[in-house]
Amino acid sequence: MTKDDESLDLVKQAIREAGLRATPARIATLQLLRESPSPLTHAAVAEHLSGLGVDKATAFRNLNDMTDAGLLRRTEVGDHVWRFET
């Protein structure tokens, strides 16, 4: 098993342990935010995932679901834009 396979398995496991289905969009979202050196906005996440066929509404819903499940943190620094991080 390669390091990438192990990382993917850990992401899937974390999503499932949080009580969510490990869909391709959620897996890609969590991987993106784990690899990001800084918090990302919904727009940035949606832009990164658009190449995978994930629309903005799905990206936003997944960010909220994963925040509610404790996988992500949501912050707002006074500019009325939420940023997400692991």
Each language-model region and where it sits:
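Short, Lys/Arg-enriched N-terminal segment that forms or immediately precedes the first helix
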Residues: 5-19
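Pre-recognition alpha-helix immediately N-terminal to the DNA-recognition helix
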Residues: 27-32
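Short helix-capping/hinge SLiMs at alpha-helix to coil transitions
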Residues: 20, 34-37
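Short, leucine-enriched amphipathic alpha-helices that occur as contiguous helical runs
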Residues: 8, 25-26
